[in-house]
Each structure stands twice: as structure tokens, then as C-alpha cells.
Curated annotation (Swiss-Prot):
<dbReference type="InterPro" id="IPR006638">
    <property type="entry name" value="Elp3/MiaA/NifB-like_rSAM"/>
</dbReference>
<feature type="binding site">
    <location>
        <position position="136"/>
    </location>
    <ligand>
        <name>[4Fe-4S] cluster 2</name>
    </ligand>
</feature>
<dbReference type="InterPro" id="IPR007197">
    <property type="entry name" value="rSAM"/>
</dbReference>
<dbReference type="GO" id="GO:0005739">
    <property type="term" value="C:mitochondrion"/>
</dbReference>
<feature type="binding site">
    <location>
        <position position="347"/>
    </location>
    <ligand>
        <name>[4Fe-4S] cluster 1</name>
    </ligand>
</feature>
<feature type="region of interest" description="Disordered">
    <location>
        <begin position="1"/>
        <end position="25"/>
    </location>
</feature>
<dbReference type="GO" id="GO:0016992">
    <property type="term" value="F:lipoate synthase activity"/>
</dbReference>
<comment type="pathway">
    <text>Protein modification; protein lipoylation via endogenous pathway; protein N(6)-(lipoyl)lysine from octanoyl-[acyl-carrier-protein]: step 2/2.</text>
</comment>
<dbReference type="GO" id="GO:0009507">
    <property type="term" value="C:chloroplast"/>
</dbReference>
<keyword id="KW-0411">Iron-sulfur</keyword>
<keyword id="KW-0934">Plastid</keyword>
<dbReference type="InterPro" id="IPR003698">
    <property type="entry name" value="Lipoyl_synth"/>
</dbReference>
<dbReference type="InterPro" id="IPR027526">
    <property type="entry name" value="Lipoyl_synth_chlpt"/>
</dbReference>
<keyword id="KW-0949">S-adenosyl-L-methionine</keyword>
<feature type="binding site">
    <location>
        <position position="106"/>
    </location>
    <ligand>
        <name>[4Fe-4S] cluster 1</name>
    </ligand>
</feature>
<keyword id="KW-0408">Iron</keyword>
<protein>
    <recommendedName>
        <fullName>Lipoyl synthase 1, chloroplastic</fullName>
        <ecNumber>2.8.1.8</ecNumber>
    </recommendedName>
</protein>
Length: 370
């Protein structure tokens, strides 16, 4: 009797190789699967060529980051306490937003990122939100044409936080707010007044925008009770349009600093320059002379560090010895205080004792009562 075709055993389905190789006979779980996968894998694509440094941005493979720029990760009791307080009150700091390399040292009170220090802690609070209306090519702060409106509770929350820290010196800074009629000057001034009301003896430094050159806005802030008016020219004249947003400018910044100086007797003014962007020594000297010509008292100089490849290319890592040269040169042309070093930033240890004494001694003396 012929066997019915229905009774015949069905053919086995083909084994699907676990490795994906159609000629592989290894079953799932076989020890040879991994080897087979490696053998059958298509060749890895050639690595993409490094993007060549553009005229302004990108990484320059010829410029290597030196050892003197290495920093320990921030830690320490004071650092942890400040970070917690800032988070609870929903405050912004330029230390975090701008990826400052000195956050551990400053928040711990100078001396080191690990918590050892001299007790002079400096935290730079960023008011008017964390979103800037400008797009400077060196800056890591996020940007938008329409940032959220300022928090009306921010001046009070900032004052409460700073008063609870027990510090004697605080730096307030802000993003640029070209969307506001006065550039945020009145909000800035409210914060200063709230601080002075809660802690009358505190010294307040304000690192400001240029308020689009609005000198009335400069006056409103300069007369709010602050002790140091700081505004950065950022770089030498020839690099302004490359480094800064087109709405900023060298002469506009000088005008802001000059006007702030004239607003109040005893006003201390301050500015900062980044190095490593391709400036020449003669250009740096001229920038210092220009600042001294309008009476700027304090100058900081630091190394520009590129946040991402989309930001300006580092053209040079300036040596600590050259920074020492600039410190001595700055003092020789008349600055009352110069902080100069690879990791120095605008607010670097702003409240150290020398600066505190400079500010206090520069205040106009009240006439003696008869």
C-alpha cells in the first residue's frame, strides 16, 4: 500500500542561525555563535574625518589642553550646602550654567575644590532667568529670542538664600535680556535692595550686561546700593565681532563702565578679558590702557576654554608665567587689583579680603556730626 502523502513526515524548518550568518550551522546557545558573529560581521566603516577647525569654531587638533588646566571634581561640605540651597530656592548660578572650572574652590571658600580653604566663599547668582537673548560664540549659557519672563519672587528668594549663607560678599550677574524694556536693570536693582535690606553690611558686586547701551538703565542699577559695578569687555577690540554677539561692542562696553563710574562717589568698577582667542600682546596692552583711561579699578584675565565644538576655537593655551606677566603689567598701568591666571574668571574669588577692604575703604566718608 502506498503511503499517503498526508502521513509523510514534514520537512524540518531551516535552522535560523543565532548569529545572523546564513551559512552558519551553529544553533542558539552554541559557544561558536560569538566567534561566528565576529567573522561574519561587515567591515567597520572607516572613522569619520575630524571636522577641520573652521575660521572661528571647531577643535584645533594642533592645540592640546595642558596639564595646568586640570581640576579636581567639586566636593566639600560648603559646596554641598550651597548647591542644596540654590536648588531648593530655584536660583541659577553662572558657576553652573557657564560651566565655571572654579566652582569647587569658590564655593568652598578658596584654596581647593575638595573643601580646604580660607573661608571666603563666593557664589555668583544669575538673576533674570537662565536663558540669554544673545548668542556670543564663547558662552555656554542657553539662548532664546523669547525667554520666559523674569520670576517676580527672584529678588526676595535670592536675598533670603544669600542671607542664610552668612557670606559678606556676593556677586550678582545676569543673562542679557534684550526682550525687556530696560534690559532687566530694574529687576537687578530690586535684588540688590532686597539684599541690602536683609543684610545691610553685605558687599554686593553686580556683573552686568550692557543694557544695549542704555545709560539710564546703567544709572538705575549703579544707584541701587551695589558696591562694585562689573561689566566685561571680554576680548580685544579687533576680535569683538567674532567673539561677541553683534549687539555688543567694545566702545559700548567702555561707555557703560565709564558712566557707572560717574554715577556714585567711590564706585568701584571692574572688567575682564579672556585670552587664547588669537589676540596679540599689543592688543591686550591697549585694552588694559583703554580700561584704565576710564577709571576701571579691578581687572581679571583668564584662559578661554571652549565649551563645545560649536563654540570658538581655542587658538592658544596661555602659560601661567604669561598670566603672571599680565598681572604685573596690569598693576604697572594702575589697576588697583589684578587677578590673572589660566582658570581665573570674572567672579573668581571676588570677595577675597583684599577686595573687601578695597571696597570698604573706598566708600565716601560721612561728615562727622557736630
Amino acid at each position: 500500500m502506498m503511503q499517503s502523502s498526508l502521513a509523510r513526515p514534514l520537512p524540518r524548518p531551516p535552522i535560523r542561525p543565532a548569529c545572523g550568518n546564513p551559512v552558519c550551522r551553529s544553533r542558539p546557545g552554541s559557544v561558536s555563535v560569538a566567534r561566528c558573529r565576529a567573522e561574519a560581521a561587515p567591515p567597520a566603516p572607516a572613522p569619520a574625518a575630524r571636522r577641520a577647525a573652521g575660521p572661528y569654531t571647531g577643535r584645533d587638533p594642533e592645540v592640546k589642553k595642558p596639564a595646568w588646566l586640570r581640576q579636581r571634581a567639586a566636593q566639600g561640605e560648603k559646596y554641598a550646602r550651597l548647591r542644596e540651597s540654590i536648588g531648593e530656592l530655584k536660583l541659577n548660578t553662572v558657576c553652573v550654567e557657564a560651566q565655571c572650572p572654579n566652582i569647587g574652590e569658590c564655593w568652598n571658600g578658596g584654596g581647593g575644590a575638595g573643601g580646604e580653604g580660607d573661608g571666603i566663599a563666593t557664589a555668583t547668582i544669575m538673576v533674570l532667568g537662565d536663558t540669554c537673548t544673545r548668542g556670543c560664540r564663547f558662552c555656554a549659557v542657553k539662548t532664546s529670542n523669547k525667554p520666559p519672563p523674569p520670576d517676580p519672587l527672584e529678588p526676595l528668594n535670592t536675598a533670603l538664600a544669600v542671607a542664610s549663607w552668612g557670606v559678606d560678599y556676593v556677586v550678582l550677574t545676569s543673562v542679557d535680556r534684550d526682550d525687556l524694556p530696560d534690559g532687566g536693570s530694574s529687576h537687578f536693582a530690586q535684588t540688590v535692595r532686597a539684599l541690602k535690606e536683609l543684610k545691610p553690611g553685605i558687599l554686593v558686586e553686580c556683573l552686568t550686561s550692557d543694557f544695549r547701551g542704555d545709560l539710564e538703565a546703567v544709572s538705575a542699577l549703579a544707584n541701587s546700593g551695589l558696591d562694585v559695578f562689573a561689566h566685561n569687555i571680554e576680548t580685544v577690540r579687533s576680535l569683538q565681532r567674532i567673539v561677541r554677539d553683534p549687539r555688543a561692542g567694545y566702545d559700548q562696553s567702555l561707555a557703560v563702565l565709564k558712566h557707572a563710574k560717574s554715577c556714585k562717589e567711590g564706585m568701584i568698577t571692574k572688567s575682564s578679558i579672556m585670552l587664547g582667542l588669537g589676540e596679540t600682546d599689543e592688543e591686550v596692552k591697549q585694552a588694559m590702557i583703554d580700561l584704565r583711561a576710564i577709571g576701571v579699578d579691578i581687572l581679571t584675565l583668564g584662559q578661554y576654554l571652549q565649551p563645545t565644538e560649536r563654540h570658538l576655537t581655542v587658538r592658544e593655551y596661555v602659560t601661567p608665567e604669561k598670566f603672571q606677566f599680565w598681572k604685573e603689567y596690569g598693576e604697572s598701568v594702575g589697576f588697583r587689583y589684578v587677578a590673572s591666571g589660566p582658570l581665573v574668571r570674572s567672579s573668581y574669588r571676588a570677595g577675597e579680603l583684599f577686595v573687601q577692604n578695597l571696597v570698604r575703604n573706598n566708600k565716601p566718608k560721612l561728615p562727622a556730626s557736630s
